[in-house]
Amino acid sequence: GAGDEWTAADVTRRDDRRAASARRAAAHAARDEWVFEGSGRAVEYVAGRRWEVAATGFWQAHRGAAQRYSDLIAEWADLGPGGRAWDLYSGAGVFAARLAEQTGRTGVVLAVESARPAVADGAAALRDLPWVELRAQRVERWVLEHVGGAAPDVVVLDPPRAGAGKEVIGAVAAAGPARIVHVGCDPAAFARDLSLYQAAGYRLADLRAFDAFPATHHVECLALLAR
């Protein structure tokens, strides 16, 4: 149908996202590093949990951001014992940890991240939460493989700056979660992604914006979408 047609702008945005994913993968590819002082590792705490991550890896730029965002995501997710959640573009599993605390041992949290070092750091930090499954895989591929399986109650997405895009959002919507939490740092890409959710039958239930990147045009936005 007409709603499924791809425009030239859609193709350009898809290619931009793929290029961004490729750059992200290249940034995390194995390469020679020299540590002149210290361990080459950084220690971060969120909600009382300790993460030890590579100093060259990804963490939120603002020192208070990981705690603030995860608090809001936990509030919006509102999962009960036995709940199911997906954490897409999960990094080292900061959001996955908060979701897992809500679902408890009878629940399942599936966390997907393409950067293997981040997945390894997350596995170490979340080793006491065996109901969290961390997958080192491209989100674009993983979601297409899991549509039609057990439906998640909540999906959290924190994609790269270019956004999640039509393919991923279409697959997430097809999975049928009751609530979706979408995170974005580029307002234009964020708005495009929200319009895709709305076209798929989701409504914007809440929206928060954080000035986490002072002196830049970037604003961290979190949206709660529901059916």
Describe the residue ranges of each PLM region.
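Accessory RNA-recognition modules of RNA-modification enzymes
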Residues: G1-L157, A164-V168, G176
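S-adenosylmethionine
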Residues: R135-C221, A226
